[in-house]
Amino acid sequence: MRFQSINEINLTSVWAQLHLHQRSTRHVEMRDLFEAESDRFLNFSIDLNGFLLDFSKNRITGRSLDLLVELSKVAGLSDWVEAARLGEQINTSEHRAVMHFALRASVDDVYSVDGQNVVPVVHRELRRCFDFSEKIRQKIWCGFNGSPIRDVVNIGIGGSDLGPRLAVQALHPYALSDIRVHFVSNLDGADLAQTLEGLDQATTLFIVSSKSFSTPETLDNAYAAKAWFLQKAQGSDVSKHFVAISSNVEAVKDFGIAPEQMFRFWDWVGGRYSVWSAIGLSVMIAIGERHFRAFLDGAREMDQHFFTAPHEKNIPVVMALLGVWYNTFYGAHTHAIMPYAHGLARLPAYLQQLDMESNGKRVGRFGEMLDFDTGPVVWGEVGVNSQHAFFQLLHQGTRLVPCDFILPLRSHYAIGQHHQQLVANCLAQTEALMRGKTDTEVLEELQAAGVTGELLDALLPQKVFPGNQPSNTIVIDELSPHFLGMLLAAYEHKVFVQGVIWGINSFDQWGVEYGKQLAKRIAPELASTKPPKHDSSTNALIERYRTRGCRS
């Protein structure tokens, strides 16, 4: 069943039952559930070939999960998944298919768009990318003076930056040591200028990533990079040092990049789902074909699990249902991401775009206003750094903050007992958030330490931890290309499932357009002497720039 109008999902019986169930169980303590259920971990965890989702530390019972699974069925999740697989235009506002999972398909898979199997063209483009990346890696592709490429600069923004940047950092142990990969996304000139410091035009390759090749931030940086390059090179040398990831052949040619040095992706691939495509060229150069294929294979394994596993044993579905439970029925409003792996430091930023650009919407897929809470604010920080930043709020604040902990069991860097201590910290935090520390337990600790009288009375409430903060723990064997692929694909599918339940089109992003329109209007006004015609605040800020800012 696919909903066609406003409020149908929240007028269903299961929606009402979930509200009643939340009210009747909201004071249940997770520590009590663990004490009462010796097999709670087994009942509330899913292991997929070394990828473990432990969701036992959540405010749920078996009844909670049953109701949430029923909600997914009533929302027509299976139908929507099948529609996506069949290439139907589930991106309803832009009338496009959504087929990013075809980017990691095997040669024998069949995924069709407009009646054509797209898998062969995907593999042909991948082959072109691999061949080019191997020329860079093997020092066959050289710069204008015959020197091999030593630095690769990826210029892009949003999905053309966040995914590749995350993957290159996460998979650093698998990368070549003699080719450095850099990323430029910010329109602040400091980003490009500081990246170019110490680079040599003769040994630098630029990858300009923009599907339309008209993204202002990307093109401004690309033309500035080209100007820097031409300080030491000739115009004819551009072809050796610039390649494009785009679908706009003419714009790429106008920039000076030959069509044979343009790698393409398709309108059925959204930017935030594109790291698996030619957008991942910088990743391919860093880690090579074998490891990039392992990255794709990991994602495909999660795809097949998502397509075939029953909802109650389906990792992305369960992750999504728990998010709906807290955001829509508990009013949590935020979701924290804590990867206990330095290589995943960029994961929170990547998931911010994936989740909030997809589901940060108040309008349903058919234009109706939604009157329930949808996508959360996603935020986070890496590992123990987060403990020394915001865990005070998680442990003793006033807000419910569901958390995801991501933990590799093995490290690529065996330095003393570092990794064992890291694992201990991660597991300790999940237990502490769940269990808390009661006033009775605190009292016993203080008395055992000899604290009495007024000091005891003052310290006692300060040292109580309410606990009952929900979390998922995602455990992977190691941070490898395969497991990274599984992890990112799991979150992709999670976001899709939530969009289906909330009645949202998760594959457009109209909210990013309005600010761009105003910026185009304001930019010439900054250099003008005419009075600006905005609100008083914006007018005053424009005038302040005119008098105190630097014109360029």
Swiss-Prot record:
Cellular component terms per the entry's GO annotation: cytosol
Q: In which pathway does it act?
A: Carbohydrate biosynthesis; gluconeogenesis; Carbohydrate degradation; glycolysis; D-glyceraldehyde 3-phosphate and glycerone phosphate from D-glucose: step 2/4
A Pfam family that this protein carries is PGI
According to the record, the residues making up region (Disordered) are 525-552
Q: Where in the cell is it found?
A: Cytoplasm
Enzyme class, broadest EC rank:
isomerase
Q: Source organism's superkingdom?
A: Bacteria
* Catalytic activity of the protein: alpha-D-glucose 6-phosphate = beta-D-fructose 6-phosphate
EC number(s): the record gives: 5.3.1.9
- Which residues constitute the catalytic centre? E357 (proton donor), H388, K516
Checking InterPro entries in the record gives: G6P_Isomerase, G6P_Isomerase_C, Phosphoglucose_isomerase_CS, SIS_dom_sf, SIS_PGI_1, SIS_PGI_2
- Function, as annotated: Catalyzes the reversible isomerization of glucose-6-phosphate to fructose-6-phosphate.
Family statement: Belongs to the GPI family.
This protein is called: Glucose-6-phosphate isomerase
Give one GO biological process term: glycolytic process
HAMAP family (alphabetical)? G6P_isomerase
At the highest ranks, the source species' classification is: Bacteria, Pseudomonadati, Pseudomonadota, Betaproteobacteria, Neisseriales
The Gene Ontology terms for molecular function here are:
carbohydrate derivative binding; glucose-6-phosphate isomerase activity; monosaccharide binding
Q: Which UniProt keywords apply?
A: Cytoplasm, Gluconeogenesis, Glycolysis, Isomerase
